[in-house]
From Swiss-Prot:
Gene designation: ispH
Reaction catalysed by this enzyme: isopentenyl diphosphate + 2 oxidized [2Fe-2S]-[ferredoxin] + H2O = (2E)-4-hydroxy-3-methylbut-2-enyl diphosphate + 2 reduced [2Fe-2S]-[ferredoxin] + 2 H(+); dimethylallyl diphosphate + 2 oxidized [2Fe-2S]-[ferredoxin] + H2O = (2E)-4-hydroxy-3-methylbut-2-enyl diphosphate + 2 reduced [2Fe-2S]-[ferredoxin] + 2 H(+)
Names of required cofactors: [4Fe-4S] cluster
Organism listed in the record: Magnetococcus marinus (strain ATCC BAA-1437 / JCM 17883 / MC-1)
Function summary: Catalyzes the conversion of 1-hydroxy-2-methyl-2-(E)-butenyl 4-diphosphate (HMBPP) into a mixture of isopentenyl diphosphate (IPP) and dimethylallyl diphosphate (DMAPP). Acts in the terminal step of the DOXP/MEP pathway for isoprenoid precursor biosynthesis.
Record text on cofactor binding: Binds 1 [4Fe-4S] cluster per subunit.
Protein name: 4-hydroxy-3-methylbut-2-enyl diphosphate reductase
Pfam families: LYTB
GO BP terms, alphabetized: dimethylallyl diphosphate biosynthetic process; isopentenyl diphosphate biosynthetic process, methylerythritol 4-phosphate pathway; terpenoid biosynthetic process
Length: 307
């Protein structure tokens, strides 16, 4: 069997930074360090950090006064920020800088009196954080093409859209086309909000799909970008499965497969790829790299955690 490894795959710069913030905080302040929500959507990462002293909570009211508290890479609402400032907590913000860029964009649009539309998945932590940057009526969520037709805006001439950073590039493009058809003067982001890593990993999967009989995507079931990778593979004509680790692979999937493509979501560590290759006895197969681009971006840590 031929095995194709997508490049790029796995951790993006925002995930690298978020995990490093937790590790540096543990090193500097000692455990326990509290993290609001999963720092990134990956069970292996969460358990690895939990074993080192990180405590994951749903809300800030679960954190004792005086503790170190970290916001996850997905970002938080203004209300959560205000609660963190009100409480005697030592706050560290691991929000991805590209998510933070979308937050600032929403604020600027609101300041300029635009009705803001957010294209994203309802219930996702990033969407909840972005929606929470403005008062409720000032931002509307578009999760499905049908939502566009149902929009009722007080001033259709003064409308702008932003997007969740981890969406399918192709599906978002189609939804944007619908918005433009309904609101010809709609204001677009100065630069596309879907992050570089999401786009790069989807492009790599498109290339994998052309060359593979089956694609395995390593990632968590609640990871938006990992789910999109599986969907992109299927939309480009290739069978695909989202798996959390090598144990999820079912032997019948591999029957008749001559070329297997492997990739990993932006929150999936490379060790999971290595374990999958070992599980497949990769040394007995032809393993190749399928590269569509290289990534060199890195985000700095908060000042107090820099060495």
């Amino acid at each position: 069997m031929r095995i194709l490894l997508a490049e790029p795959r796995g951790f993006c710069a925002g995930v690298d930074r978020a995990i490093a913030i937790v590790l540096k905080a543990l090193e500097k302040f000692g455990p326990p360090i509290y993290v609001r929500h999963e720092i990134v959507h990956n069970r292996w990462v969460v358990e690895h950090l939990r074993n080192q002293g990180a405590v994951f909570v749903h809300e800030l009211d679960e954190i004792p006064d005086g503790a170190v508290a970290i916001y996850s890479a997905h970002g938080v609402s203004k209300a959560v920020q205000a609660e963190g400032e009100r409480r005697p907590l030592h706050i560290l913000d691991a929000t991805c800088p590209l998510v933070d860029k979308v937050h600032r964009e929403a604020e600027r649009l609101d300041h300029d009196h635009y009705q803001v539309l957010l294209i994203g998945h309802a219930g996702h932590p990033e969407v909840e954080g972005t929606m929470g940057q403005l008062q409720q009526a000032r931002m509307k969520l578009i999760s499905h093409p049908d939502d566009v037709a149902q929009l009722r805006l007080s001033n259709p001439q003064k409308v702008a859209y932003i997007t969740q950073t981890t969406l399918s590039v192709d599906e978002t493009r189609a939804m944007v086309a619908q918005l433009k058809a309904r609101f010809p003067t709609i204001k677009e982001p100065a630069k596309e909000d879907i992050c570089y890593a999401t786009q790069n990993r989807q492009n790599a999967v498109k290339a994998l799909a052309q060359a593979s009989d089956l694609i395995l995507v390593l990632g968590a079931p609640n990871s938006s970008n990992s789910n999109r990778l599986r969907e992109v593979a299927e939309q480009h004509g290739c069978r695909a499965f989202l798996i959390e680790n090598a144990k999820d692979v079912e032997i019948q999937w591999l029957e008749g497969v001559e070329t297997l493509g492997i990739t990993a979501g932006a929150s999936a560590p490379e060790i999971l790829v290595e374990e999958l290759l070992a599980h497949l006895h990769a040394e007995q197969h032809q393993v190749e790299l399928l590269s569509v681009t290289k990534e060199y971006l890195a985000f700095p840590l908060p000042l107090e955690l820099r060495e």
